[in-house]
Amino acid sequence: NCPAGCRSQGCCM
C-alpha cells in the first residue's frame, strides 16, 4: 500500500 497522497502523485504503482 501507499501513503495517502502518494497514489495521486503516481509515485506508487
Curated annotation (Swiss-Prot):
The keyword Iron does not apply. Signal peptide: none annotated. Contains 2 disulfide bonds. Expressed by the venom duct. The keyword Secreted applies. GO terms for cellular component: extracellular region; host cell presynaptic membrane. Keywords: Calcium channel impairing toxin, Disulfide bond, Ion channel impairing toxin, Neurotoxin, Presynaptic neurotoxin, Secreted, Toxin, Voltage-gated calcium channel impairing toxin. GO terms for molecular function: calcium channel regulator activity; toxin activity. It is found in: Secreted. Omega-conotoxins act at presynaptic membranes, they bind and block voltage-gated calcium channels (Cav). Reversibly blocks calcium current in the dorsal-root ganglion neurons of the rat (high voltage-activated channels but not low voltage-activated channels). Does not modify the voltage dependency of activation and inactivation. The cysteine framework is XVI (C-C-CC). This is Omega-conotoxin Cl16a.
